[in-house]
């Protein structure tokens, strides 16, 4: 039993993060504190000063733990990371949490690649963005590819390395083939420097130079050449124009406001660049309840700017936010220069902030309308499903299973989960078939169902004994309905397995027609036809398509890995760890075969003798 009085008494007088848990060990709230002792004790004192949401949370707290940090800033960063990790019920949850795309230039490579990524990291490479307009970033990348024939492969190419055969991109003028030694590092970097200058928007010498070349070509009556240079100039100008929308400068500003109803809210952000509104984004925030606006916006700003590379100099908000000084310091450190959070009282900036709030209200109303419509459609489909199957209640949680193999090789099983009619990807599970030899789908299904419910019962017992936290369980939640991607045989196997464990869960099968389209449901060894186009047909089709897709994808990945491993296993001095490192670095047998001695030696765990063994194997 958790001793609250003792734990509250020994709380430290230091900054840190506290983690509240319910009786199942599930994390329900994460918070930061300047002084842990003072902040955590407040929750368990007079509840009259608490909001309704906080009172509800405190009732559910069965235990808490804390992490001491060296500073309040560290506590803020850790709080953001833990909220992302656990998605606690009582923390502010962004419904539309987005990771905006960046253009990444791998400047730590001899021959850099340029591509779009949603993962920003301090890894020594150059990033441009984030691009709040996803279409714009791909338009910019398309123009860059037209202008600059850069490599797109993931090969480890170093200057002076062993040349390899040029790929198709070289022959269609989309790559200069540094892999084959057709371009020097210095020449390649001239293109990279041009791209960086264009994306920075700081160097107009490129366009001036091209205009001179175009004029010269025209004077010499080389009109085709002049036209190509003109197209190049137009493309560069278009990139520069698009970049202006996303390059944060000294005078650039973001405007953030919030609109809430009795339960949820919408945060709206307007991006102002060079005095013009160039873009906007909205985020739905669920279960706000009666949380103060200053707390919600403070949490939103920490979350929104926590994963972005660029932060404006000034952020305007409707009122002073909680921990404003700390948040400003946090953003200043990320930006590298002073960031201000201000409250406009009158004038154009106040009017623009009012517009932001009005737009937030419109987006929240539209979102609610859409959610209600989607919820009603799913509820209607689940109600129809319950009627067809004769269930006493709606099957809120559905688990669907499928087997995939080719002639019994690399047999796998998969489980997908739908809750309230929507796919819940975080609960998907994959199984390698261990005990069944050859193509036997029935016994393979018996194995994965036995493993799933065996693990589930074990976890339930561990949770009861407090040896496992509910949030860490993978199989402890049981479904209201099981769907088998197959007919009578698969359904009967599932019923046998459940009976063996003493578990009562309804089971049905999903069958397809001769065109491989979902046709109906198998129940009690009889097929029930479902009307095409109905809400129920749409639901079971989504379930069947998803479990089949997940099974095929997993089987394909295992098959590819097995093919790679089977060849590498024949190479002397290359054990399991070295095989894994080679695959991680080169990605394919072909790339390993083409790798130079230097590239092989640069692979973790590969010494000179192992590298020589690889070269000898592929040259024989």
Swiss-Prot record:
Superkingdom of origin organism: Bacteria
Main location: cytoplasm
UniProt entry keywords in alphabetical sequence: Cytoplasm, DNA damage, DNA excision, DNA repair, Excision nuclease, SOS response
UniProt-annotated location(s): Cytoplasm
InterPro entries for the chain: DisA/LigA_HHH (IPR041663), GIY-YIG_endonuc (IPR000305), GIY-YIG_endonuc_sf (IPR035901), GIY-YIG_UvrC_Cho (IPR047296), RuvA_2-like (IPR010994), UVR_dom (IPR001943), UVR_dom_sf (IPR036876), UvrABC_protein_C (IPR050066)
GO BP: any one term: SOS response
Molecular function terms from GO: DNA binding; excinuclease ABC activity
Function recorded in the entry: The UvrABC repair system catalyzes the recognition and processing of DNA lesions. UvrC both incises the 5' and 3' sides of the lesion. The N-terminal half is responsible for the 3' incision and the C-terminal half is responsible for the 5' incision.
Subunit organization: Interacts with UvrB in an incision complex.
Name of the molecule in the record: UvrABC system protein C
Source organism of the structure: Clostridium perfringens (strain 13 / Type A)
Lineage of producing organism: Bacteria, Bacillati, Bacillota, Clostridia, Eubacteriales
């Amino acid at each position: 039993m958790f001793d609250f009085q003792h734990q509250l008494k020994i709380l430290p007088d230091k900054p840190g993060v506290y983690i509240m848990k319910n009786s199942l060990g599930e994390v329900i709230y994460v918070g930061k504190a300047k002084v842990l002792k003072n902040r955590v004790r407040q929750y368990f004192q007079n509840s009259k000063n608490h909001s309704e949401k906080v009172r509800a949370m405190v009732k559910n707290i069965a235990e808490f733990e804390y992490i001491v940090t060296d500073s309040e800033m560290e506590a803020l960063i850790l709080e953001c990371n833990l909220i992302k990790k656990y998605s606690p019920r009582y923390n502010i949850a962004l419904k539309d949490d987005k990771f905006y795309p960046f253009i990444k230039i791998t400047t730590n490579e001899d021959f850099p690649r340029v591509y779009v990524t949603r993962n920003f990291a301090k890894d020594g490479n150059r990033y441009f963005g984030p691009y709040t307009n996803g279409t714009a970033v791909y338009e910019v990348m398309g123009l860059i590819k037209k202008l600059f024939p850069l490599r797109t492969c993931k090969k480890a190419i170093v200057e002076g390395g062993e040349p390899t055969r040029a790929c198709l991109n070289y022959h269609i003028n989309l790559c200069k083939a540094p892999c084959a030694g057709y371009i020097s590092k210095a020449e390649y970097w001239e293109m990279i420097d041009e791209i960086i200058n264009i994306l920075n928007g700081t160097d107009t010498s490129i366009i001036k130079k091209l205009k001179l070349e175009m004029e010269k070509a025209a004077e010499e009556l080389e009109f085709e050449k002049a036209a190509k240079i003109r197209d190049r100039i137009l493309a560069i100008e278009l990139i520069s124009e698009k970049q202006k929308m996303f390059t944060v400068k000294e005078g650039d500003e973001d405007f953030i406001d919030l609109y809430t109803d009795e339960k949820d809210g919408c945060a709206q952000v307007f991006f102002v660049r060079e005095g013009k509104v160039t873009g906007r984004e909205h985020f739905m925030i669920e279960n706000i309840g009666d949380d103060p606006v200053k707390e919600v916006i403070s949490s939103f700003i920490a979350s929104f700017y926590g994963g972005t590379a660029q932060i404006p100099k000034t952020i305007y908000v409707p009122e002073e936010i909680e921990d404003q000084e700390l948040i400003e310091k946090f953003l200043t450190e990320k930006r590298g220069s002073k960031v201000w959070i201000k409250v406009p009282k009158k004038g154009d900036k106040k009017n623009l902030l009012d517009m932001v709030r009005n737009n937030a209200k419109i987006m929240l109303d539209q979102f609610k309308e859409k959610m209600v419509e989607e919820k009603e459609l799913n509820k209607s489909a689940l109600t129809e499903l319950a009627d067809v199957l004769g269930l006493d209640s709606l099957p809120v949680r559905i688990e669907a299973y499928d087997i995939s193999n080719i002639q019994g090789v690399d047999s796998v099983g998969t489980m997908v989960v739908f809750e309230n009619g929507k796919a819940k990807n975080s609960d998907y599970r994959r199984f390698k078939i261990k005990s069944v030899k050859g193509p036997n789908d029935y016994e393979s299904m018996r194995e994965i169902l036995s493993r799933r419910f065996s693990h589930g019962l074990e976890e339930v017992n561990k949770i009861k004994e407090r040896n496992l936290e509910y949030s860490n369980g993978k199989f402890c939640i049981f479904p209201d309905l099981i769907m088998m991607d197959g007919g009578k045989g698969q359904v009967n196997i599932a019923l046998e397995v459940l009976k063996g464990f003493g578990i009562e869960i309804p089971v049905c099968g999903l069958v397809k027609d001769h065109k491989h389209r979902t046709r109906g449901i198998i129940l009690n060894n009889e097929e029930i036809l479902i009307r095409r186009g109905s809400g129920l047909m749409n639901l079971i089709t989504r379930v069947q398509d998803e479990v089949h897709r997940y099974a095929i994808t997993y089987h394909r990945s295992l098959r590819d890995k097995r093919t790679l491993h089977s060849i590498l296993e024949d190479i002397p001095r290359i054990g399991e760890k070295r095989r894994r490192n080679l695959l991680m670095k080169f990605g394919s047998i072909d790339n390993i075969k083409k790798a130079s001695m230097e590239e092989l030696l640069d692979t973790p765990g590969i010494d000179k003798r192992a590298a020589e063994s690889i070269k000898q194997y592929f040259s024989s």
